[in-house]
Amino acid sequence: MVARRRKRAARDPEDRIPSPLGYAAIPIKFSEKQQASHYLYVRAHSVRQGTKSTWPQKRTLFVLNVPPYCTEESLSRLLSSCGPLQSVELQEKPDLADSPKESRSKFFHPKPVPGFRVGYVVFQKPSGVSAALALQGPLLVSTESHPVKTGIHKWISDYADSVPDPEALRVEVDTFMEAYDQKIAEEEAKAKEEEGVPDEEGWVKVTRRGRRPVLPRTEAASLRVLERERRKRTRKELLNFYAWQHRESKMEHLAQLRKKFEEDKQRIELLRAQRKFRPY
């Protein structure tokens, strides 16, 4: 019985890889030294008829089981032999078909959760998807020409990437605030035009406006706000926080009382000498 199983396993070809229904399996290895293969499960991205999708149909490859060490650059290099690529994006979970695609900020975005991810690979031509589905492996993620950083080298690189460029950060913040101010101005102008105008049913929309105007986003106004906050923090600072500070403050207070007492005694002696002492 055991001999039959061994013969059957020997006759089975290596390319027969179990995969989920509708997916093709692509074996990959981290490097040449690794013996075991990891499998990417791919299929052509498709949605139901009449449903909008942020990814182009017939040119998008959906990838499952992407390991943490496989970056967008690595996945792009692995699939570059299938045809010219337009974009590669890795995500924590698949996109909803009807969810709007938001622009990704370079600095303000949630930290990705470490673990396996899904990928969307967009080719310039539909033939790239067909070539990727027929791709044979194993493919190497880390090579001598394109090494993948691991260990302390990866930690150093991640730390360096976590420090933003001040000028690029300022440009992105200014761009966002300009777009936000423009949006608010358009909404206020539209509300002002519709003020007092009845709708189809004869109702008049009443909007509340604050008495205090919005502070302008100028450098002088920002400096005034910062100075006001600094003075407020100074007033709220803890006094006599430590025990030795409390003892010193009590000693200084007693010294001031003694000094005032001596000054009062001298003044009383002086008034007695001048015979103008009036205790009541």
From Swiss-Prot:
Record domain RRM: where: 59-159
Swiss-Prot/TrEMBL keywords: Cell projection, Cytoplasm, Cytoskeleton, Nucleus, Phosphoprotein, RNA-binding
Domain of life: Eukaryota
GO CC annotations on file: centrosome; cilium; CURI complex; cytoplasm; nucleolus; small-subunit processome; UTP-C complex
Entry GO MF terms: RNA binding
Any Gene Ontology biological process: ribosomal small subunit biogenesis
Family: Belongs to the RRP7 family.
Name of the protein described by the UniProt record: Ribosomal RNA-processing protein 7 homolog A
